[in-house]
């Protein structure tokens, strides 16, 4: 089970988990959707050169993996904050005690620390003045790396994790007697936002030159389903701007290196997917799994708040 929550002024994904992944949040406007995911088996998530050193602490490893991926795409890593740690650990303990995965707590239940992520972060003593978010993973694994990577695979969750303006975060973990692990990362900002991206800039994922990218993604296991009526699809490819920017797409394509034919994809933008996709992000999802050990070329042409943006990059599957 994985859950994610975010609050910001313009985009409020609210993803509530039933099985494996979820996200929820707010910050001004509000909206609701849900997300679940089973992705790469843990045994297939291999340690990469330059990756964080495994600590065998779920909270630390999950938090560090999120920062590792953020750094790889050119985003500022989240600064770990002890007050946010307290909020995340309190909620993780609540989930473990009550054997569930959810963003909202019910007053009166054992371990109650606050109804919503915002309440819990504020109660910890952290003064939120801008954005907040929450990621929760619950799965029978002891790998924080794996839990965080699952969230990044799920496209609606990735949109939030790779928000450029997040500033600080904290994490907590717990494991029950059956070996079922819970991992929570809370993200927030005060004194406005993090540095974000320069005006008119974007980041992409998979990033240019990335290797060992997964070939497929189980769309049915993320709710809302990003590719309705189809389960196994190709690995999602995404473009991200600051949340207060407007990203428009003129062309967004992917093809096997050396091929003259673009893959058939589903495009996610604010105009094609208005409920679940923010105005600052876009993604394409190939409608068939990618080939193993194959390089793919991606092209994006569009605008960020009216400024022309063109990107061409490649990645290679495992």
Predicted regions and their residues:
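C-terminal motif of bacterial Sec signal peptides marking the signal peptidase cleavage site
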Residues: 20-23
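Functional surface patches built around histidine and acidic residues
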Residues: 2, 25-258, 297-300
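Bacterial N-terminal signal peptides that target proteins for export
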Residues: 1-13
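Acidic, low-complexity Ser/Thr/Gly/Pro-rich repeat segments typical of extracellular/periplasmic
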Residues: 54, 226-318
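A generic local structural motif
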Residues: 5-6, 138-139, 283
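Sec-dependent N-terminal signal peptides
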Residues: 14-18
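Short, solvent-exposed coil/turn linker segments
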Residues: 1, 116, 266-270
């Amino acid at each position: 089970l994985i859950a994610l929550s975010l609050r910001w002024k313009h985009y409020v994904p609210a993803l509530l988990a039933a099985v494996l992944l979820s996200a929820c949040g707010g910050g001004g406007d509000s909206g609701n959707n849900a997300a679940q995911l089973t992705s790469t088996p843990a045994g297939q998530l291999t340690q990469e050169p330059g990756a964080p050193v495994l600590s065998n602490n779920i909270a630390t490893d999950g938090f560090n993996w999120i920062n590792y991926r953020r750094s790889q795409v050119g985003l500022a890593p989240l600064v770990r904050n002890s007050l946010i740690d307290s909020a995340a650990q309190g909620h993780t303990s609540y989930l473990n005690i009550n054997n569930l995965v959810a963003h909202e707590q019910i007053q009166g239940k054992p371990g109650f620390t606050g109804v919503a992520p915002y309440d819990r972060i504020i109660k910890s003593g952290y003064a939120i003045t801008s954005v907040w978010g929450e990621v929760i993973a619950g799965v029978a694994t002891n790998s924080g790396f794996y839990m965080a990577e699952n969230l990044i695979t799920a496209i609606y969750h990735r949109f939030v994790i790779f928000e450029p303006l997040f500033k600080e975060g904290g994490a907590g973990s717990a494991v029950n007697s059956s070996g079922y692990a819970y991992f929570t990362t809370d993200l927030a900002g005060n004194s406005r936002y993090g540095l974000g991206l320069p005006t008119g800039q974007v980041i992409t994922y998979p990033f240019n030159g990335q290797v060992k990218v997964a070939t497929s993604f189980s769309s049915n296991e993320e709710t809302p389903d990003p590719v309705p009526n189809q389960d196994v699809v190709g690995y999602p490819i995404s473009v991200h701007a600051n949340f207060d920017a407007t990203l428009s797409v003129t062309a967004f394509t992917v093809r096997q290196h050396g091929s003259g034919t673009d893959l058939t994809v589903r495009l996610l933008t604010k105009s094609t997917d208005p409920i679940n996709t923010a105005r600052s992000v876009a993604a394409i999802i190939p409608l068939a799994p990618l080939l193993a050990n194959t390089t793919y070329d991606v092209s994006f042409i569009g605008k960020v708040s009216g400024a022309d943006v063109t990107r061409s990059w490649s990645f290679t599957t495992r």
